Amino acid sequence: MKQRIVTALILAIVAVCLILLAPTSLFASVLVVVWAVAVWEWTGLIGMRAAQVRIAAVLAVVLAQAGLWSVRDSSLWWAVLVAGVIWWPLALLWMRRYTFSASPTSRNKAIKLLAGLCVLVPAWAALVQLHGETPDGRLWTLFALVLVWAADTFAYFAGSRFGRNKLAPRRSPGKNLDGVWGAL
């Protein structure tokens, strides 16, 4: 536990310095690397085991991010941001109907991969936009990420300490309502 806390503190200091001091181009580039790791993890979580498929997914996201960066002042950039906003309520409705823990068929894995990409690419664009848009963009980026980090931390500790009532046992068995209240 001590090593986990020290690692978290070091990463937090690096992240805060990156957010507050780095130009948006460097911030975006570092996020590309973080997102590549996230895609690799996501493909593993959804049951994709073939390394070449996972690498292809990572490359697809990196290329999408590079392409978006090259058109960041265009309507395509804004279309991706709007699509990301529209995606979230649709995903919530979809999760009520679709069982993500369904049989691990190729089709289900492809759907899960697409769902992850619909979250990750717009989220990257949103953070980059927030960071570079206004003179206070760096502070707003820090505020947004601290809010997420705090909610995640409080959810973890509240869920670990008090968690009895499962939130969605078939989709995410470790999540519970007490964690939700801790996050809020």
Each language-model region and where it sits:
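Membrane-embedded alpha-helical bundles of polytopic integral membrane proteins
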Residues: 1-184
